[in-house]
């Protein structure tokens, strides 16, 4: 049986909710994370530290990788669909966004990457990987305190030559 190798990549988009500034009346804008502390302290509102957010992103990363592999194994025949690991990278940004009514969020633009070895067609690989990734994204195990949204975009599958 001929096994083909496929490089699979996707963008992983995360929104972290940081809180609401009730007295903020200016236009929506981007702001450096370090400048937010002063705004939150002026309203006596809890504000998550960068370390807390980094730990939450580490948890999401680890659990997303685990859940993806678990769902992939559930959806496929292990002897026909081989995968060793999946890598998710979610770098914490230095900027946050304050919406019109004071809602403060941080957007994380991350990546997903893996290699699959299978006898399935490229279309079948796309369908299975997309489904496993969506199931993993919907998993309750990914929930962390400040996670507001999690999605993938630009799923790309390329065959790797010999």
What positions do the PLM features span?
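Periplasmic peptidoglycan-binding/tethering modules of Gram-negative envelope proteins
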Residues: 31
């Amino acid at each position: 049986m001929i096994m083909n190798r496929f490089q699979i990549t996707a963008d992983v988009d995360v929104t972290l909710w940081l809180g609401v500034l009730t007295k903020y009346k200016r236009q929506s804008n981007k702001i450096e994370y370090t400048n937010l502390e002063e705004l939150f302290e002026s309203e006596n509102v809890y504000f998550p530290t960068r370390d807390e957010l980094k730990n939450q992103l580490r948890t999401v990363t680890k659990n997303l990788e685990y859940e993806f592999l678990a769902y992939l194994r559930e959806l496929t025949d292990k002897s026909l669909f081989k995968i060793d690991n999946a890598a998710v990278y979610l770098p914490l940004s230095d900027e946050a966004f304050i919406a019109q009514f004071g809602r403060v969020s941080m957007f994380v633009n991350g990546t997903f990457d893996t290699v699959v070895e299978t006898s399935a067609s490229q279309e079948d690989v796309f369908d299975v990987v997309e489904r496993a990734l969506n199931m993993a994204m919907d998993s309750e195990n990914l929930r962390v305190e400040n996670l507001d949204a999690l999605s993938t975009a630009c799923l790309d599958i390329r065959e790797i030559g010999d």
